[in-house]
């Protein structure tokens, strides 16, 4: 009795697999809208700059984030980058200054060769 159920399950499983593979090949790809030259100019004109600190706030992507109290582990050193994790996700990395953390920092030590 169990051999019969096993055979039918295997048969319908293979049939379903073949059907799904066949349908996957028949779906036409969605074309992407063409990029205009204006879009290309706008993309190349916005460089991604690292965060900067002026003592009162951390600037990232043109937006200033006021410094919050951070754990002692967030005291940045020259050869370390600190991934700033908070309630809004990762804002970025801070280079040689106080971390741009909202809640907590995770210390990521990097080699000078990787910078």
From Swiss-Prot:
It comes from Equine herpesvirus 2 (strain 86/87). Residues 1-25 form the signal peptide. Keywords: Signal. This is Protein E6A. The gene is 12.
